[in-house]
């Protein structure tokens, strides 16, 4: 995927790597990868984006892949880099979507770039830790034990977290070389997620992403974990642009309590709940199509409902 690599220099002098997919003249959507991840996270059948008239732009969040690290970054700092990419490409208005650990960063863009973001989507996104209605026990409830361990390492600080993540990354590289579907073998995933991991599309993206996401070390992963469990730097109740919240009821990586909290607290949001899906969705091509159609045109996904603060 080296031919896809593009870079820019941010106003503070960092290198930021990104890639473009689909209809390069289409409606721009900036997609923010999960934790960990990189710019290669996307649906591998690029024609889907072109058919929808969407120009999908992915980037390596600071510290991942080919992007320079930004130590001490907060979730609220991600809009700086999203704005830099949009300015570089001449996008005045655009959609933003983020999945899993990218979800909070998409919400940050919705909150802090209201003059640029048309609509945003938070897909199986993490909720803020320790907020009213979602204390630490509730935030951790239902999470796989492997996830809980990672949270505890992050709470202990970078000195504990970094070597543990480095060991996990080395293990992931070994597994992906043998069989990408085993990358999450230590997790007690739902049947839906186990089935998704075994699909050719998912295995392709897992292989590409893991080989690329930590070429410069695990600094991006470390910084994501620390940012997500810390105060985000903004409140979701200031969001004024339309937001789609989607979550699955069998998710053990970001349990449904997170989606429920976001649905109850993000003003004016649309909510799509999948009773079968876990973290990886039940029909990714259909779900991505619905999500991008909504981001680009405002057509609501089937069976979505207005949140309580609509």
Task: Describe the residue ranges of each PLM region.
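Conserved HGGG/HGGXW glycine-rich cap/lid loop of the alpha/beta-hydrolase fold
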Residues: 14-66
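N-terminal cap/lid segment of alpha/beta-hydrolase-fold proteins
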Residues: 1-20
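Conserved hydrolase catalytic core segment
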Residues: 92-138
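Conserved acidic catalytic loop of the alpha/beta-hydrolase fold
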Residues: 77-95
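Conserved alpha/beta-hydrolase "acid-adjacent" motif
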Residues: 252-258
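Catalytic active-site module of serine/aspartate enzymes centered on a nucleophile-bearing elbow/loop
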Residues: 268-310
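Short beta-strand/loop motif that positions the catalytic acidic residue
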Residues: 239, 245-247, 251
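Alpha/beta-hydrolase
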Residues: 140-234
